[in-house]
Curated annotation (Swiss-Prot):
The active site is at residue 639. It is a lipid-anchor. The lineage of its organism: Eukaryota, Metazoa, Chordata, Craniata, Vertebrata. Catalyzes the hydrolysis of sphingomyelin to form ceramide and phosphocholine. Ceramide mediates numerous cellular functions, such as apoptosis and growth arrest, and is capable of regulating these 2 cellular events independently. Also hydrolyzes sphingosylphosphocholine. Regulates the cell cycle by acting as a growth suppressor in confluent cells. Probably acts as a regulator of postnatal development and participates in bone and dentin mineralization. One of its GO terms (biological process) is cellular response to hydrogen peroxide. This is Sphingomyelin phosphodiesterase 3. It comes from Mus musculus. It catalyses: a sphingomyelin + H2O = phosphocholine + an N-acylsphing-4-enine + H(+); N-(15Z-tetracosenoyl)sphing-4-enine-1-phosphocholine + H2O = N-(15Z-tetracosenoyl)-sphing-4-enine + phosphocholine + H(+); N-(tetracosanoyl)-sphing-4-enine-1-phosphocholine + H2O = N-tetracosanoyl-sphing-4-enine + phosphocholine + H(+); N-(hexadecanoyl)-sphing-4-enine-1-phosphocholine + H2O = N-hexadecanoylsphing-4-enine + phosphocholine + H(+).
């Protein structure tokens, strides 16, 4: 399938569209600024309360007549531009595809050659987030503002979080339940390798810090500054760090004589100091940014290499990193596993390291989408943005906004399809909300069979009273997904050209699994075909699952204004009741605070990550390895991003 890199099929239409939008934009911008000046956020209200001279109010009164005068002057030009813009939308393509050619060893082409579908399994990490990048006046209805600056900061934080070192902690205690047994293979053999998954006979208590290249580096950094310090000439950045936290004999750490340790890159073994991660270069968003990998003391283990046998009499001091046990235990405590759970789950201050696929919702503003794309291209090679339709093309109602869907991938995209929900009503009818379907290639077998996966990203109808509309959209979602798989799958079942190893649905579904008003959606057949890792059954959540919709009134409180603070708050039941949104109460006169005191549960979880256990290739299985609720976008959106790591392996393999 040919992917569309431009919104129009030829340059003539593109030029005509650019001219028509240039005529419309001044009017659009003035209306947005005029409305935004009358919708203050709680942050701005607090600033005004601290302003004894009422300077901000004076500016609003002063500039409102100016905006109105300019708006009247811009209206004729906007009307002329609209005459050309509207019919052009019938020829507009439903998305724009962008690929950044990446020569890094972690680029998409190199990733395909890593995994042949034999030997060890491979994990893939998915994340979804509603980022509320609406025009500024509409974003303020959700108590967020400055859409353009937020778009850039969101991109920086996601990039820095995904490109940070991947930390895994392994403890040999047979009673420990805070670590992932399924993750152990990634310590023994690198992901994507075909090496044996055999467990060494003696496992020491270790913490593994794995990082796979400076994927978070901005594309322009290397051109301007040259290769990052510490990078090898060939760009290979495969390194790891073993941290001893237990198993001492006589008060001294044991030597790293394991077979597993022998497969790790040893710190200080070469001329390059391995204790410094290459993606800690000074770059956009690192200095003072909450998205910096160094922003959280508790989410990362800080490594520092020792001097070359300078002040240490202990042999091998510069090839081992010693840490206090309490520091590593603090990091390990972030992962908690329920006794009956087969995977790790946590509230994390960072997006998962080595994030493979990112699905975003509410990226409605075109300029914000461009800024977001520019930032994320520092890590993701393949991006689809500006997804949706405008005008009356393909839908009953006139569409002023696109779908808001945005997709980024480290792996090549093979096929794409988009469908607009035809039953939108109320204010949701102004946006072309729909579903984006993607087929990605993640490897190839020795027999030249492609290893592929399917991903669907969607955003359902928002008004809470329209349950029937959402159920109809879920029906359409399943039908469209079945048609997409049928139209893009290999024709021969006896000798297939492709192996399907995962099928994932993610997005903002705008209903939860705890509200009595959402019973219709909770019992939908989608949840029989796709598994929700956070759900026990209709209306029943797993005890560790928390809501993903924040109470907008508290977005700028000091307790939750940073990723670390929000993480700590959400780990306590009292904090969740204070800062998460809960189902609306039907009892009249019940205050927000008093209502929450009477509620049970952990808030409204409306952002979902679902995966299929059936419909994959025979003898293959996809199992959840980790599930995360992420606080890294605190203060930038009213939703919590969620992430899921799937371990894909042949069914006959032993874990």
């Amino acid at each position: 399938m040919v992917l569309y890199t431009t919104p129009f099929p030829n340059s003539c239409l593109s030029a005509l569209h650019a001219v028509s939008w240039a005529l419309i934009f001044p009017c659009y911008w003035l209306v947005d600024r005029l409305l935004a000046s009358f919708i203050p956020t709680t942050y701005e209200k607090r600033q005004r309360a601290d302003d004894p001279c009422c300077l901000q109010l004076f500016c609003t009164v002063l500039f409102t007549p100016v905006y109105l005068a300019l708006l009247v002057a811009a209206l004729p030009f906007a009307f002329l531009g609209f005459i050309f813009w509207s019919p052009l939308q019938s020829a507009r393509r439903p998305y724009s595809y962008s690929r950044l050619e990446d020569k890094n060893p972690a680029g998409g082409a190199a990733l395909l050659s890593e995994w042949k579908g034999t030997g060890a399994g491979k994990s893939f990490c998915f994340a979804t987030a509603n980022v509320c990048l609406l025009p500024d006046s509409l974003a303020r209805l959700n108590n967020v503002f400055n859409t353009q600056a937020r778009a850039k900061e969101i991109g920086q934080r996601i990039r820095n979080g995904a490109a940070r070192p991947q930390i895994k902690i392994y403890i040999d205690s047979p009673t420990n339940t805070s670590i992932s047994a399924a993750s152990f293979s990634s310590l023994v053999s690198p992901q994507g390798g075909d090496g044996s998954r055999a467990v060494p006979g003696s496992i020491k208590r270790t913490a593994s810090v794995e990082y796979k290249g400076d994927g978070g580096r901005h594309p322009s950094d290397e051109a301007a500054n040259g290769p990052a310090s510490g990078e090898q000439a060939d760009g290979s950045l495969e390194d790891s760090c073993i941290v001893r936290i237990g198993g001492e004999e006589g008060g001294r750490p044991q030597e790293a004589d394991d077979p597993a340790a022998g497969s790790q890159a040893r710190n200080g073994a070469g001329g390059t100091p391995k204790g410094q991660t290459p993606n800690h270069n000074q770059r956009d968003g690192d200095s003072g940014s909450l998205g910096s990998p160094s922003a959280s003391r508790e989410s990362l283990v800080k490594a520092r290499a020792g001097q070359d046998s300078g002040g240490s009499g202990e042999p091998g001091a510069n090839s081992k990193l010693l840490y206090k046990t309490s520091v590593v235990k603090k990091a390990a405590a972030r992962r908690r596993r329920h006794p009956d759970e087969a995977f790790d789950h946590e509230v994390s201050a960072f997006f998962p390291a080595n994030l493979d696929f990112l699905c975003l919702q509410e990226v409605f503003d075109k300029r914000a989408a461009a800024k977001l794309k520019e930032q994320l291209h520092g890590y993701f090679e393949y991006i689809l943005y500006d997804v949706g339709v405008y005008g009356c093309h393909g839908c009953c109602n006139f569409k002023c906004l696109n779908s808001g869907l945005f997709f980024a991938s480290r792996y090549p995209v093979m096929d794409v399809a988009y469908h607009c929900y035809p039953n939108g009503c109320s204010f949701d009818a102004l946006a072309s909300k729909g579903a984006l379907f993607l087929k990605v290639q993640v490897g190839s077998t020795p027999q030249d069979q492609r290893i592929v996966g399917y991903i669907a990203c969607t955003h359902l109808h928002a008004p809470p009273e329209d349950s029937a509309v959402r159920c109809e959209q879920l029906d359409l979602l399943q039908d469209w997904l079945a048609d997409f798989r049928k139209s893009t799958s290999s024709t021969s079942t006896a000798n297939p050209e492709e192996l399907v190893v995962f099928d994932v649905i993610c997005g903002d579904l705008n209903f939860d699994n705890c509200s009595s008003d959402d019973k219709l959606e909770q019992q939908h057949s989608l949840f029989t075909r796709y598994k929700d890792p956070c759900r026990l059954g209709p209306g029943e959540e797993k005890p560790w699952a928390i809501g993903t919709l924040l109470d907008t009134n508290g977005l700028y409180d000091e307790d939750v204004c940073t990723p670390d603070n929000l993480q700590k708050v959400l780990e306590s039941e009292e904090g969740r009741r204070e800062y998460l949104a809960f189902p609306t109460s039907k009892s009249p006169g019940a205050g927000q605070k008093g209502r929450k005191d009477l509620l049970k549960g952990n808030g409204r979880r409306i952002d979902y990550m679902l995966h299929a256990e059936e419909g994959l290739c025979p003898d293959w299985k996809a199992e959840v390895e980790e599930f995360s609720f992420i606080t890294q976008l605190s203060g930038l959106t009213d939703h919590l991003p969620v992430a899921m790591r799937l371990m894909v392996s042949a069914g006959e393999e032993e874990a």
